[in-house]
Amino acid sequence: MIATMVSQLVKDASIKELEEAGLGTQYTEHGKGIYPNDSNGVPFTAAYINSVGDPIADLVEDMTAEQKARATYEHLLNLADDEDVIQPLLFLRQREIVHFNRFKELYEKYVSLGY
């Protein structure tokens, strides 16, 4: 969703504006297309998604991922000044909180069952 937001924000930008925003190399390789990568330019990979087949370990990993996503959305909110960007970020941040709480409930249930 963040890649889509960035794509929408740059769709009408000139090449000069992209260069001034530090997106010159991104434009060189990908134009204004969506290319999910982190702030250092490292592309997304499915290797980030891990599962070991143990419900407790997997749920803890899921909860950790939700908290990291929440923190990232908070960092993006701190940088944002456009209400059309802020509102979706607030929604996405809240979604991470809800996901974390659901994973936590399931984690607690598995622990109570002796896993």
Where are these regions (language model features)?
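Non-heme di-metal
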Residues: 1-115
